[in-house]
Every structure is written in C-alpha cells, then in structure tokens.
C-alpha cells in the first residue's frame, strides 16, 4: 500500500512558446535576478553608494552565476556526458534541435565559485571592497536560490530517496510510483529562512556591522543545509565513500565560512565599501555622463 503522499505532475513549462517555452526553472532564475537587483539597489541607496557600481556589478554577477553554475553542474555531476565530442556544445547551448529547453542543470557550488572569481575581478577594476559587497549580495542570493530550487520542483527534478512521510512527492511525470523526498522544496524553504534572517540582521544593524560577518555565517548556514539534505539525495554517490559528492563539495565552504566569520568578529577584514577610496577616474566619468543625460532631458522638456 502506497502511504499518504502528494501526487506531482506539473507541466515543467511555465510559458509555452511554439514547440518549447520558458520553463519554471528559467523563470525562477529571472525572478531571482529581478528581485535581487531591486533589493541590492535599495541597499546601495540606503548606504549612499553610487548606483553605477550596481549596474556594473549586475553584469558581472549574471555571467558569474550562469557560467559558474552551469560549468559546476557539468564538471561535478555529469562530466562523462558533457565533456565528450558529441555533447560538449550542450554545455551552453539551450536548444534541443529547434526547440528551446533552457539549462536543466545548474550547481550552487559552481555558482559560488563563479561569484567569488567575478568579485575578485570586479574589485580589481572598481576598487570596491569585495567583502562589503558579499555581505549584501549573499542576502539576495539566498532568495534567488529558493526560486531556483522551486523551479527544480516544478520541473520534477533533483528529488531524493523513497519516504513514507506524508509530504513525500510521487513525481508521476518521471514515471515514479513511490513517494520521494522533495529535496528541492526542503532547500527552498531553508534558503527562504536564511534570506529572512540575513535581511533581518542587515536591517536591524542598519548596514552597520563588521564586514564579513553576514557572508561568513551565510556560508556556514547555506552549505550546512546542503550537507544535511544530501543525506536523502541519490545523485552524486562516490564509490567507497559514505558522503555524497555534494557533501564533499560543501565542506570547504562551511570551513571557509567559519574562518571568515572569525576574522570578521576580530575586525580583521577591511571595513566599508571603499577602504582605499573610490576610483576617482570612474566617478568623474559617471558624473560627466549623468550631467550629459540631465542636460538632454532638460532640452527635451523645454521643447
């Protein structure tokens, strides 16, 4: 007898376009960036940081998360398939023949590495404190992660082992007949809680806290959750290991988070958005551009 469970058979395509369409997964990715931009823009405005820095940061983050998450999935979880002469183009090609299918494999570990590398490049160019940015950026990344994981649930993918718990999902679209742990839903709920606590702390401190403190504990919380949920997952098994691949990948981030939190508590990380001062050349360039746009609008309104 099948225990009480949720029968899940949702269409993975949220918006149909011809033979294909926009999947829930891709929609979640877009919502994550839209809401993330809105929230971080308010943080920058609240702390009197030039909005031009955010416009540049958005491009860096979009490319870092997309490329990092996609490469992370292909390298860590499906290397044997993608890195072959027949399938390597599929790494970044979102079409199956003439049908748009989007990207059906993104890894949070790869996204995290991509973000860190992109911020290093951003810091080199814009002279902005990467630790300060990370404290604010990870708040919205947790929200984005929740949307993406909900997209996984709607796509009937990344679920766990069999369960007799009443909230087990029978993923009928995949031909499943036994309830499974909805691990994507577990992660989405956990990420929403991490987002709520991080945002609450940021607002409570009014943005005035030791640099690196949110980022450090965020790493511990998010990848700690990933480590625990992996116990009821099935993909990523390593022969001869009691831990799954996702757990081994999470451990360095947890340890790194603890180290960063310790340095932050001791005040050993650079404080403020511009500890060495702003890039005066860029600031002057943006000011001239803003003045030019302002004059154009004035002339247009006077006509």
Regions found by a protein language model. Give the residues of each.
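Hydrophobic, membrane-interfacing alpha helices
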Residues: 1-303
């Amino acid at each position: 007898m099948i225990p009480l469970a949720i029968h899940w058979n949702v269409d993975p395509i949220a918006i149909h376009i011809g033979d294909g369409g926009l999947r829930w997964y891709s929609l979640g990715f877009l919502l994550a960036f839209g809401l993330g931009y809105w929230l971080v823009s308010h943080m920058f405005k609240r702390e009197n940081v030039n909005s031009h820095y955010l416009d540049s940061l958005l491009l860096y983050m979009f490319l870092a998360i997309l490329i990092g998450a996609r490469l992370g999935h292909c390298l860590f979880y499906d290397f044997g398939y993608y890195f072959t002469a027949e399938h390597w183009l599929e790494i970044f090609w979102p079409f199956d023949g003439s049908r748009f299918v989007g990207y059906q494999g993104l890894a949070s570990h790869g996204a995290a590495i991509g973000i860190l590398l992109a911020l290093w490049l951003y810091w080199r160019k814009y002279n902005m404190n990467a630790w300060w940015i990370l404290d604010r950026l990870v708040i919205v990344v947790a929200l984005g992660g929740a949307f993406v994981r909900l997209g996984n649930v709607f796509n009937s993918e990344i679920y766990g082992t069999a369960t007799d718990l009443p909230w087990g999902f029978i993923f009928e679209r995949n031909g499943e007949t036994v309830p499974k742990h909805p691990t994507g839903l577990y992660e989405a709920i956990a990420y929403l809680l991490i987002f709520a606590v991080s945002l609450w702390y940021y607002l409570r401190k009014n943005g005035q806290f030791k640099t690196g403190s949110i980022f450090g504990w965020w790493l511990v919380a998010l990848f700690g959750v990933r480590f625990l949920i992996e116990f009821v997952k099935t993909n990523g098994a390593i022969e001869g290991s009691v831990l799954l691949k996702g757990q081994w990948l999470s451990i360095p981030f947890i340890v790194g988070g603890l180290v960063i939190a310790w340095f932050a508590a001791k005040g050993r990380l650079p404080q403020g958005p511009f500890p060495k001062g702003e890039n005066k050349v860029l600031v002057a360039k943006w000011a001239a551009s803003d003045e030019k746009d302002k004059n154009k609008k004035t002339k247009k309104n006077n006509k």
